[in-house]
């Protein structure tokens, strides 16, 4: 039977995720599911609502068979790097047949057409891209305009400019395009399948329906409490969230990050801040000025934001600074791609999948950290140790956000065992 791969954050697992999981199984006729999941920080540049171990329990109880952690160095990057890291891990398992993802369009073919253009970068497309960048547009905006211009000027594309334009406006379509691009990049045989998303959109804050966005669910929890979102999440998700909240481990207090981030920024010089990915050409001064004129994280981001700098991009950059992941660190780690499978949890089917992965893959399976990381060292020349050290640091920082101070001890990655639902 085919094996299904999904890439997700489960922040938290909700009814829309369950629909996606069931549909994915039906469409692909798969009987086993491998999930690549972000750790304690998500791609938006925020801490997850609850930690990766609780979210792993949710995934297992809701029907996922094996959960592998996406390393931090891919988890808090742009959609392109996020997708590349996760897709590469699925490919490296040597067991996955399908990658199924939710999208606003649900049209795999049109996403493949766009992904192919962006991956191959035909000559005319590259010329348009250079032109728009030289006009001062941000790279994402320049790429979007270049794509539409290329489609308009090219005869053999089976979709209209308007159809392509509609597709690339939606966040899950964009992420799906990046997944397919990554499959092209690594020459994977995994088949991409888009499923049309049900319910409210990605940015919707409505809690009126059974299927709504994770954004709305998180907002509801923070502002109105857990019971306000009960209809939008599965019973097992509700149970686990309730347990975590009662145990003082959630919802995490995001505002506790602000002093650490502001302190880090205020210590930096323009020369130092230029070492971080995407902070150049005067942006370093914008970040530093904002740091000295802001007393909260929200105020800091508002003072940095402009038409070319989105809220999420700024949040990701602030996490890079907090974790001291410089551009050169990313470049060193990017050269070889993901170096390991960090196993967060599995069930009986997942146990069989692990046996197959162990036989077929060149990457090590990590179920216990100590044999692979004797000492946390983010400057290690060993790329596995370097990447794992950032994962450990992110958990150490995350634990400081628990509501109950007694739960905030560090080095949890060495202490918490793999979660088994057997």
Swiss-Prot record:
GO terms for biological process: tRNA modification. ATP binds at residues 7-20, 102, 172, 197. GO terms for molecular function: ATP binding; ligase activity, forming carbon-nitrogen bonds; tRNA binding. Its EC number is 6.3.4.-. InterPro entries: Rossmann-like_a/b/a_fold, tRNA(Met)_cyd_acetate_ligase. Keywords: ATP-binding, Cytoplasm, Ligase, Nucleotide-binding, RNA-binding, tRNA processing, tRNA-binding. Its main location: cytoplasm. Pfam families: HIGH_NTase1 (PF05636). It comes from the Bacteria. The keyword Transmembrane does not apply. GO terms for cellular component: cytoplasm. PANTHER family: TRNA(MET) CYTIDINE ACETATE LIGASE. Belongs to the TmcAL family. Catalyzes the formation of N(4)-acetylcytidine (ac(4)C) at the wobble position of elongator tRNA(Met), using acetate and ATP as substrates. First activates an acetate ion to form acetyladenylate (Ac-AMP) and then transfers the acetyl group to tRNA to form ac(4)C34. This is tRNA(Met) cytidine acetate ligase.
